Amino acid sequence: SCEIHLSGETGEVNSEMLKMFRRFPLKRLIFHRKNTFRDMQSVIASQREVEKQAGIRPEAGMEFEAFVLNEMCQFTGAFCNSLHCDEMGYLCRVSYWLGTVRNGDAVPEKIMALQEQAWDQEPDLKAYDESGYLCGETGCGLCALYQLKQAGITHLKLVGRGNYVDHMEKDIRNLRKALEILDAAENEREFKCTLKRIVFPAGCSERCYYQ
């Protein structure tokens, strides 16, 4: 039979929302990018308690998925006002700067300062490989894997829509490598240090899902 996975593009994810959807029932809940570790842990703990009281075996319980690589969305998915298709650029990727407006015109010195600040935030060119690939260039949650595991996340979402096939292959390999490092690490500090040394030896994009 078919299983229902609730998309990570829903407007809100919390215990009350999950309670409303239990009547369907759901096999998997996908958290969106703005959920904190505490949010996720609270929702998962609430569901696990319901399953325990209902006598549901742990392996048959609801699955929980979180975003881990690519396409960090400043509009939080459900509130996107852009059009996503391969033929047009995404609104969220159009360069812009926020600045003070004076008499209907942007203040020039403020614009210049913000522009320089934006350039400073770009990843170091040395972090890219010879094909122009940088793991997590448009959004990354690999450093958060330890905390996602602690929160009770069972599955990870690697976004691949519109991406190059060879870059997707590298993403999958890097995610596998990160999970191997996670399994071998004794604590979060060891995990992050090893991850940065092996997966990001020249630095990362610093476009973190989970701050």
Q: What do the PLM-derived regions correspond to, one by one?
A:
Residues 1-16, 20, 30-211:
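Active-site pocket-lining/capping segments in soluble small-molecule metabolic enzymes
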Residues 25-26:
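As written
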